[in-house]
Amino acid sequence: MKILFAVSEAFPFAKSGGLADVAYSLPKALRNLGVDIRVIMPKYSDIHPDFTTKMKHICHFTVPVGWRNQYCGIEYLNLDGVPFYFVDNEYYFKRPGYYGYYDDGERFSFFSRAVCEAVYHLDFDVDIIHVNDWHTSVIPVLLKAHYGHSDKHNKIKTILTIHNLKYQGIFPKEVMYDLLSLPDEYFSEDKLKFYDAISFLKGGIIYSDKVVTVSRTYANEVRTLSYGEGLHGLLSGIGEKLIGIINGIDYEVYNPATDKLIFVNYDSNTFENRKKENKFRLQQMLNLPVSDEIVLIGMVSRLTKEKGIELIERIINKLLTLPVQLVILGAGDYHYEQMLKQYAGAFPSKVSANICYSEELARKIYAGSDMYLMPSLTEPCGISQLIAMRYGSVPIVRETGGLKDTVKPYNQFTGEGWGFSFANYDPAELFATIKYALSIYNDKNQWRNIVHQAMTQDNSWNASAYEYQKVYESLLNS
């Protein structure tokens, strides 16, 4: 089978969030299973010259964008065994950053149409186009509307992965007419119409052959009013077309046994003393009292309501009366940034607020923390809890989305489980869960068992890639 993976960003070329990590790691894992998958993405001007100088120009053609024909070049680079195609157009992509421009509707209309046109020109007989989030969700629509006559296109199946339903690519209806060249019939409730505008993501949900969210629980949540972002009715109505496949993490990148960014390397057999050394050195680095009796709770997160910072604000005064240190890394809403800075100033022996992002400090927090906090309001999948488990930091999570699917709550009677969880978005429940985790921490045998279970869970991309391979096979056999 031949899969074209269409995405707006991919590590290490362009990254603004977790989508880029998926676009690098999932194709790599699928190729290890023997799937011929290739990635296609925009050639942004921010891509490092170390990569652009190695790209090979393979073809160029014009792409219809409304009444105009725009130049499109295709460049190629193989990275870690994965072929990448880059869509080159300086008018749309020679700018700082990736998103947030007034003409994003036009930019990603062009990119989506360019992917469709590229099928004519690539030496690659595409069976499935795998699209991701709103940026490429209009590709299945375009295939049905404009390419039904093409022998190269009419056999192509499509799969859409929704990484976060909140971002839907909502644009004025003129984008549909003037840029996508779609007739009036597409501006209807059963097609692209979303209130008085159009939604790229809605089009992808309707016209793709399969829809995947990034966890089983999130696949159920998005069918409800609370999580459906206005599309719950549509998602409830597509039945088994919608499934959930949990994301993984790259075990070569996130490996405490080889990670050069942490103080001391360790694995699931040697963590007990070596992880403690990471904790002590992190405490020293952040000017916190060095002690193993004090529980170091880590958090690497955007500082937003969605990530549960509101709950932390509600309990922080009570939390700081307990034998804990709170180490937070991230940036976000000004209110939360200032709140954490104030507590770090008032309680310098208890709180370290690092209002920035540093991959090196993030790794040191994963390796040096005893517990890892993710009290999210919403979390489609969540990657941080998987990294924390890999590094032996026991997650405390709210039971939502991928957090519910990946963190099994510890049962002190059976000894099973590798984390702690609470159900409702409620500060009292979060505080009670932290207190319970602290009581278990004091029993070193129980805690050692929990950490070992967390570190030995398989959250690599292997299982996820196998699930996607099965979906691809089912589409080709349908």
UniProtKB/Swiss-Prot annotation:
CDD domains: GT5_Glycogen_synthase_DULL1-like. Keywords: Glycogen biosynthesis, Glycosyltransferase, Transferase. Pathway: Glycan biosynthesis; glycogen biosynthesis. It catalyses: [(1->4)-alpha-D-glucosyl](n) + ADP-alpha-D-glucose = [(1->4)-alpha-D-glucosyl](n+1) + ADP + H(+). Gene3D superfamilies: Glycogen Phosphorylase B (3.40.50.2000). InterPro entries: Glyco_trans_1, GS/SS, Starch_synth_cat_dom. One of its GO terms (biological process) is glycogen biosynthetic process. GO terms for molecular function: alpha-1,4-glucan glucosyltransferase (ADP-glucose donor) activity; alpha-1,4-glucan glucosyltransferase (UDP-glucose donor) activity. ADP-alpha-D-glucose binds at K15. Its EC number is 2.4.1.21. Pfam families: Glyco_transf_5 (PF08323), Glycos_transf_1 (PF00534). Belongs to the glycosyltransferase 1 family. Bacterial/plant glycogen synthase subfamily. Synthesizes alpha-1,4-glucan chains using ADP-glucose. NCBIfam families: glgA, PRK00654.1-1. This is Glycogen synthase.
